[in-house]
A protein has these predicted regions:
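Signature of N-terminal electron-transfer/Fe-S-associated modules in redox systems
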Residues: 1-154
């Protein structure tokens, strides 16, 4: 198998992987970063969301070959001011119920606040539409995003 070079969370990785292997499985099985979750395998639930060059991307349908030379950030590598505000708001407002979808939710919310520091409810709903929460904590997710935005603007 060909060797694929990746930069994940600021670290260079060389992995032996078929170029069509989804990034999700390379992150989890080859690199050992299990915070990114498998939910549906067809980019419909958002559990597999990572950042690629600062944009939210579904890793379950992204071939690892499409990522060569690009910057990948997983939930384990988040460290921006917006990410810290989102994580704090998630804890403060008790957003998590079962927790399975939360890494994807946090990844999407972080990109939203990095691009739009004062989102409206509509902005939040649009940005988070690709993330499904089977426990239906959507109201708490929206409240946490507003709280994180307020913290960032303080």
């Amino acid at each position: 198998m060909p060797v694929v070079s990746l930069k994940v969370n600021g670290h260079a990785h060389q992995v032996d992987a078929d170029p069509q292997t989804p990034l999700l499985w390379v992150l989890r099985d080859e690199i050992g970063l299990t915070g990114t979750k498998f939910g549906c395998g067809v980019a419909q639930c958002g559990a597999c969301t990572v950042h690629v060059d600062g944009q939210a991307m579904r890793s379950c349908v992204t071939p690892v070959s499409a990522i060569a030379g690009r910057k990948v950030t997983t939930i384990e590598g988040l460290g921006s001011r917006a990410a810290k505000a989102v994580q704090k708001a998630w804890v403060d407002l008790d957003v998590v119920q079962c927790g399975y979808c939360q890494s994807g939710q946090i990844m999407s919310a972080t990109v939203l606040l990095e691009q739009n520091p004062k989102p409206s409810d509509e902005d939040i709903d649009l940005a988070m539409a690709g993330n499904i929460c089977r426990c239906a904590t959507y109201a708490r997710i929206r409240a946490a995003i507003h709280a994180a935005a307020a913290q960032l603007s303080a």
